[in-house]
Amino acid sequence: MTEKPKPTTAVERLEKLTGTDLHDLCDAAEAAIKGGGGFGWLSVPPRHIMEAYWRGVLLVPERQVFAARLDGTICGSAQLARPPRNNEAQALAAQLTSNFIAPWARGHGLARHLVLVVEDAASAAGFTVLNLDVRDTQAAAIQLYEGLGYVRWGTHPAYARVDGREIPGHYYFKRLGGEALPR
């Protein structure tokens, strides 16, 4: 019996779209949205809207977009958002946002790898804290973040509306570089 070859995985910063990147990114986002993990979207927007979103987010100077690939195909993404320039008091903290892996690509460690690459990029950019928030219904994401050392510091009881009902959302932070928390 021949063993199936192990798929190749990679995570990289996406600075421009080449080849089938835009198509793959839209397909992966669509699959994640349909699977309930659409980083804010609850229903799939028209394709031209999604394409404009991805083209546009790459142009935002305060954002870095990262892509996860399975066998060379984009299957997920995350963004590192810098604080606005007028918020000097919180210049130490960046935001991990818009994080997803398409359901068909889960189980290969890409979600973890994606978060770790974003953490490294945040640290390299001089940030000492990474913040994120997540809907209470995203159990796998919560398990991932808590397993990577993110600390839940609060819950908003009416964070989002899904299927006509309000659901809670949780706020997390992580000190980068292993710094101790202030006492």
At which residue positions do the language-model features occur?
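Structured loop/turn residues at beta-strand edges in well-structured enzyme cores
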Residues: 73, 125, 165
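Acetyl-CoA-dependent GNAT
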Residues: 12-104, 115-117, 121, 175-178
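C-terminal "cap" of GNAT-fold acetyltransferases
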Residues: 3-7, 94, 128-131, 135-142, ...
